[in-house]
Amino acid sequence: MVDDSAVVRQVLVNVLNDAADIEVIATAADPLLAIEKMRKQWPDVIVLDVEMPRMDGITFLRKIMSERPTPVVICSTLTEKGARVTMDALAAGAVAVVTKPRLGLKQFLTESADELVATVRSAARANVKRLAARVTAVPLEAEVKHTADVILPAQSGRALAQTTERIVAIGTSTGGTQALEEVLTALPRVCPGIVIVQHMPEKFTAAFAARLNGLCQIAVKEAANNDRVMPGRALIAPGGKHLLLRRSGAQYFVEVLEGPPVNRHRPSVDVLFRSAARAAGSNALGIIMTGMGDDGAAGLLEMRQAGARTVAQDEQTSIVFGMPKEAIKRGGADRILPLGAMAREIVTQLQ
């Protein structure tokens, strides 16, 4: 646990040590002290602040990933600057991000403690060798588990193909920021409209979208209500809100809305995929990529049953082979592809 705030360290340590399967073996106020302690006992997961004295978290992260790749969870503040730095950390190899406790510690313990524990568990299962290789190649959840029914009730029958416009729906979680960067930067300007759910806290998705927009040939933005899904543009669900695909005549739009977490996530991949099955049917391509848990597995099956093409990322290239594995197990994927083949699969959706 590396954070320059003693209060934050204590809160996070207490939360993690309360979990039966997690033990915090050391804490440090800065990366240099952390390195000394880690040499005595190397951790399975590092929880890291990004703004600290003596050595910033990004420099420390790059050092770790180059010398001894280890899953790193970024603990960052909900500020614009914090979001930008967090995006740099994810690009440098961090597997996930959680929000730092604020003054309302009681609210944090109520709303975010379970998310912190689940994120650390997920990080411990991450394929760090794959993550470290990707970093080198690319320069610089709620107690009640709701289903998508609480946002969009299920319905029988296939969507009517009232348009020939193709769309792509992508869902991902742990390791997804790096995976999405690899896929989206490989796309040409001429490609189908894309809608994306990446599990990420609110206020971080805008910075993530802005970063990708600067790297990609296609346009990338955080989705706003009633944004049109257009060829050559990707819309990323805002953190803390669900994203649905809607059709009006021959055009597709997105709806951004509040609602309870689904599969302990908001945004939820299942919600997006169900809406894509209903609105686009056989005009859609559904892709589920790296991530822990089962969010998106049921929705991908619904997309396939509605006539869509569906793809799951393979185990070898996934940072965490959880969501794709569950989708494959349930019969939702008609193809299993490595990450490097996803961009080509998206382009063929135009044909």
From Swiss-Prot:
Q: Which reaction does it catalyse?
A: [protein]-L-glutamate 5-O-methyl ester + H2O = L-glutamyl-[protein] + methanol + H(+); L-glutaminyl-[protein] + H2O = L-glutamyl-[protein] + NH4(+)
Where is each Response regulatory domain found? 1-115
Q: Does the record bear Hydrolase in its keywords? A: yes
Q: Where is this gene product found?
A: Cytoplasm
EC identifiers of the protein: 3.1.1.61, 3.5.1.44
An example Pfam family from this entry, by short name, is Response_reg
Q: Name one GO molecular function term.
A: phosphorelay response regulator activity
- CDD domains documented for this protein: CheB_Rec, REC_CheB-like
User: Organism's domain of life?
Assistant: Bacteria
Provide one Gene Ontology cellular component: cytoplasm
Q: Broadest EC class?
A: hydrolase
Q: Which keywords has UniProt assigned to this entry?
A: Chemotaxis, Cytoplasm, Hydrolase, Phosphoprotein
Name all CheB-type methylesterase domain ranges. Answer: 161-351
Question: What does the record say about PTM?
Answer: Phosphorylated by CheA. Phosphorylation of the N-terminal regulatory domain activates the methylesterase activity.
Q: At which residues is 4-aspartylphosphate found? A: 49
Keyword Flavoprotein annotated: no
The positions flagged as active site in the entry are 173, 199, 295
Example of a GO biological process term: chemotaxis
Q: Which family does it belong to?
A: Belongs to the CheB family.
Which PANTHER family does the UniProt record give?
PROTEIN-GLUTAMATE METHYLESTERASE/PROTEIN-GLUTAMINE GLUTAMINASE, PROTEIN-GLUTAMATE METHYLESTERASE_PROTEIN-GLUTAMINE GLUTAMINASE
What does the entry's free-text domain comment contain? Answer: Contains a C-terminal catalytic domain, and an N-terminal region which modulates catalytic activity.
What this protein is reported to do is described as: Involved in chemotaxis. Part of a chemotaxis signal transduction system that modulates chemotaxis in response to various stimuli. Catalyzes the demethylation of specific methylglutamate residues introduced into the chemoreceptors (methyl-accepting chemotaxis proteins or MCP) by CheR. Also mediates the irreversible deamidation of specific glutamine residues to glutamic acid.
Q: What is this protein called?
A: Protein-glutamate methylesterase/protein-glutamine glutaminase 1
Q: Which organism is it from?
A: Xanthomonas oryzae pv. oryzae (strain KACC10331 / KXO85)
- Lineage of the source organism? Bacteria, Pseudomonadati, Pseudomonadota, Gammaproteobacteria, Lysobacterales
Q: Which gene encodes it?
A: cheB1
